[in-house]
């Protein structure tokens, strides 16, 4: 299973902002409170059978030593954090680095905020990566992300998902369902 690019084009960002209303039940705040992010991930993360795909120390290190200027948006319902996104700008695009939410409604609210940033900064769109049929890929599709269905053109590159292990190939480690492939864990992002 290869990792693929997902995207929302700038025109789609404008569509999202012009034809969807802001949900007043949610408040989105830009901050870097790592404890809130880890609590959201622990409570609402994609795969409950993965104990912890990164630690508080890893997240602190990653945000303290960025390759890019990371921005974190946390969505609250009342006083309760119910989702977050971490993103950065690169080469005229907004890259979604990490994400988690309690519901489709929350994820669409967060994507709407990213769409506003995309429009305000005159970016080409929002991009990220995931395995298409994984939980992450399904989340992105529900949030309005698309994939290029053609073999040529922009964002068609496959990013190989390779597992190097001394265990037999039929091991559960070799199943894509045992892995949570998110951009924050990719070395180059």
Residue ranges and their predicted role:
Residues 1-98:
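Amide-forming acyltransferase catalytic core, primarily the GNAT-like/NAT-type
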Residues 1-22, 77, 84, 88-108, ...:
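Active-site/acyl-donor-binding loops of N-acyltransferases
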